[in-house]
Curated annotation (Swiss-Prot):
Protein name (Swiss-Prot/TrEMBL): Signal peptidase complex catalytic subunit sec11
UniProt keyword list: Endoplasmic reticulum, Glycoprotein, Hydrolase, Membrane, Protease, Signal-anchor, Transmembrane, Transmembrane helix
Membrane topology according to the record: Single-pass type II membrane protein
GO CC list: signal peptidase complex
Function according to Swiss-Prot or TrEMBL: Catalytic component of the signal peptidase complex (SPC) which catalyzes the cleavage of N-terminal signal sequences from nascent proteins as they are translocated into the lumen of the endoplasmic reticulum. Specifically cleaves N-terminal signal peptides that contain a hydrophobic alpha-helix (h-region) shorter than 18-20 amino acids.
Broad enzyme group: hydrolase
Assembly description: Component of the signal peptidase complex (SPC) composed of a catalytic subunit SEC11 and three accessory subunits SPC1, SPC2 and SPC3. The complex induces a local thinning of the ER membrane which is used to measure the length of the signal peptide (SP) h-region of protein substrates. This ensures the selectivity of the complex towards h-regions shorter than 18-20 amino acids. SPC associates with the translocon complex.
Length: 191
């Protein structure tokens, strides 16, 4: 009877150890993601190219690394932005930049003794597109606001690696297969 109880405790310990190891892996991945987000000053420091609008510079499925620490964005720079009201990142090149003087901000900063930096407005376009992105922007928006809309500027990429993400989102059954294989590996590893 005691040997059966000891075997059950051993299985319980093994199960708890596996759950804790899995939690450790998840929390480590989350902390790494947050650390990279803070270092790059970008809410999403790694994105996948979802369309062919930036060909030949970037292909669908390329993994992009973003940086958002620069004060200004230059014409010709490739940026990733979110359209207000939608949560799909768009990767396009800045084709025009200008600053818009905000009289209220200028008066407020002058009163506080702070320098006034006019907000930067950007117009973007995909390299493989004929027209600029004004049709993609939110209703009534003609330009992107540098501080509000830009997720980051592209600083590096790995070709094709992000295609796994695209496949998983386009074919939901692949997620089920992947989870089943992972579960099977956990069960087989226990023995």
């Amino acid at each position: 009877m005691l040997s059966a109880l000891g075997g059950n405790l051993s299985n319980a310990r093994q199960s708890i150890a596996q759950v804790l190891n899995f939690a450790l892996v998840l929390s480590t991945a989350f902390m790494l993601w947050k650390g990279v987000s803070i270092a790059s000053n970008s809410s999403s420091p790694i994105v996948v190219v979802l369309s062919g609008s930036m060909e030949p510079a970037f292909q669908r499925g390329d993994l992009l690394f973003l940086w958002n620490r620069a004060e200004r964005t230059e014409v010709g720079e490739i940026v990733v932005y979110n359209v207000r009201g939608r949560d799909i990142p768009i990767v396009h090149r800045v084709v025009r930049s200008y600053t818009e003087e905000d009289k209220k901000l200028k008066a407020k900063n002058k009163k506080a003794g702070l320098p006034t930096v006019a907000p930067q407005k950007l117009l973007t376009k995909g390299d493989n597109n004929l027209a600029d992105d004004t049709e993609l922007y939110a209703r009534g928006q003609d330009f992107l606001d540098r501080k509000e809309d830009i997720i980051g500027s592209v600083r590096g990429y790995i070709p094709g690696v992000g295609y796994v993400t695209i496949m998983l989102s386009e074919h939901p059954w692949l997620k089920t297969v992947l989870l089943g294989v992972m579960g099977l590996m956990v069960i087989l590893q226990r023995e």
